Amino acid sequence: MATDPRQLLVTCALPYANGSIHLGHMLEHIQADIWVRYQRLRGNTVNFICADDAHGTPIMLKAQQMGITPEEMIAAVSEEHQKDFAGFDISFDNYHSTHSEENRELASHIYLELKKNGFISSRTISQLFDPEKEMFLPDRFVKGTCPKCKSEDQYGDNCDNCGETYSPTELINPKSAVSGATPVMKDSEHFFFDLPQFESMLKEWTRSGSLQNETANKMQEWFESGLQQWDISRDAPYFGFEIPGEKDKFFYVWLDAPVGYMASFKNLCDKRDDLNFDEYWKKDSTTELYHFIGKDIVYFHSLFWPAMLEGAGFRKPNNVFVHGYVTVNGAKMSKSKGTFIKASTYLNHLDPECLRYYYAAKLNSRIDDLDLNLEDFTQRVNADVVNKIVNLASRNAGFITKRFEGKLSAEFAEPELYNEFVAAAERIGQLYETREFSRAIREITALADKANQYIDEKAPWVLAKEEGKEKELQEVSSVGINLFRVLMAYLKPVMPELAARTEAFLNEELTWEAIATPLTDHEITKFKALFSRIDPKKVEAMIESSKEDAAAEAAAKEKAEAEKEQASQTELDKEPIADEIEFDAFSAVDMRIARIISCEEVPKANKLLKFQLDIGGETRQVFSGIKSAYKPEELEGKLTVMVANLKPRKMKFGMSEGMILAAGPGGSDLWILEPHEGAQPGMRVM
């Protein structure tokens, strides 16, 4: 009995808009995309959305470092992110930004509803404050010495060396990571969401059975330790949305970030006539809402987010699907080893469908970390996709196109074998539905083994050489093509590009329902290579490219930090005051006001300018090494200061009878001293 199509809204966690997409991000987006494509293949209506998380202190500060506005930076990052996701065939219906009018309106509406319903309170708190930048400092923007193990240069919330967690006020010798200044404590009024009021609802939601066991168990730990009020405000300066009715107070990024799911969908609804925002988000909605996220943000999605929605009168998610981290070759991704691989770097070297297949072959419904072993990656894709599945088509297609004008046999020779393949649809479909992708892939490759075993036993290449075996040859090859068709229908959510090429080859769209009946008396097209095996040299080239990218980033960061440090230095830091001298030593130096009569370049001298100076009744010739700072014509007629009693010095280009005084580090950064109006040539400088 046919059932009505399900209506689903599916989201991926919003990538932060201050960096590139890497293969860790891609695990989640590939996992979600496979699930979404399966749902669409089964006739369900899916709206698949995402957005950039575009607010917060890190974005504000990075834009400042780049010398551009936050808006300019997040626009460029959004373009890069969307290009990367498109490169991996992530089939979003809409990709938006949390820095949007839709998000401003929805975040403000939710806040005001929570406030009206008694879930918002305020109180004064003390925080570390950067006196130079005049800004409150998030924990990660304070650095100092760990209070436990005494390791230096540790963040304000935890120690990378010993793992200790602490508050930034416990750091020894804390410094602002923004300016290097010593922070001070300062009071500020902050606004809080009263999460403990939702404990009963959250416990009931946890016990509903829809959450993963690991997530439900973790939530139980949080309940046992006690829920706390959540600080939802930040002080100016801050890149984000101002809190309605408050001056210089902004929503903390984690308040408006999940609202970005709603905003992206609202943006999609405004583009289409067939979607209704309230139908998907009203409290009694019959549509389904699913979030795919990483295990590092479970706290926000399983506690704060459903509580915010409940408190503001919206529906809650049906489920939050959580995945683990990506490791490479058994270890944390490393920039120095070249295993911190950006999505764009991967796309420059390898087929995205290879990674889609490999991730699918290792993904399950649990919160397990996934290891991208690059040697296994190469071997598995080549063995499974090329040798088992695509090879099934290539070893049979030639006989059909060359001997039978591309026509499959009129009768299907192996109905029992075919029915066995079709019967697997229910099992494989259920595995896709429950996100047990690795088990689905094992089912598919086991069928591929069986199909190849059949072809090996029937040996069409032998039949092709025997007279009178034409009918059997056509039937055997047609069975091989049809079994390949079933396998590719099952693989379509994982490898959409390979599926599209297969559809062109078969002259037929791959659908879940159509495979119930084999293709007979059907014309296929001439076989072309459908998929290329992975060349290990390309994997090595990708690793080397990642190392080069990391080295370039490190060099740029080092340069920026050096420039930042130099900019924070005073002139006295750069060149400390010299040792004290007696007054008599100073008074021995005779400095006079001089008017520059003429100034000209010295032929064959890289640094020198030649001056004629009027010092009040006497003209002096002086050579000065300020050529890189001034053009001669800029100086003529100006008053300056010279040392008049310096012993004349014979130079290659003539006699220098004194010294012009200038300030600055050198090169083009030099400035001659100029007295105020009223000073006259010859006057002594005291």
Curated annotation (Swiss-Prot):
Its EC number is 6.1.1.10. CDD domains: Anticodon_Ia_Met (cd07957), MetRS_core (cd00814), tRNA_bind_EcMetRS_like (cd02800). Binds 1 zinc ion per subunit. It comes from the Bacteria. A motif ('HIGH' region) lies at residues 15-25. One of its GO terms (biological process) is methionyl-tRNA aminoacylation. It is found in: Cytoplasm. Pfam families: Anticodon_3, tRNA-synt_1g, tRNA_bind. It is an enzyme of class 6 (ligase). GO terms for molecular function: ATP binding; metal ion binding; methionine-tRNA ligase activity; tRNA binding. InterPro entries: aa-tRNA-synth_I_CS, Anticodon_Met, Met-tRNA-synth_bsu_C, Met-tRNA_ligase_1, Met-tRNA_synth, Methionyl/Leucyl_tRNA_Synth, MetRS_core, MetRS_Zn. ATP binds at residue 335. Is required not only for elongation of protein synthesis but also for the initiation of all mRNA translation through initiator tRNA(fMet) aminoacylation. Homodimer. This is Methionine--tRNA ligase. It comes from Vibrio atlanticus (strain LGP32) (Vibrio splendidus (strain Mel32)). The lineage of its organism: Bacteria, Pseudomonadati, Pseudomonadota, Gammaproteobacteria, Vibrionales.
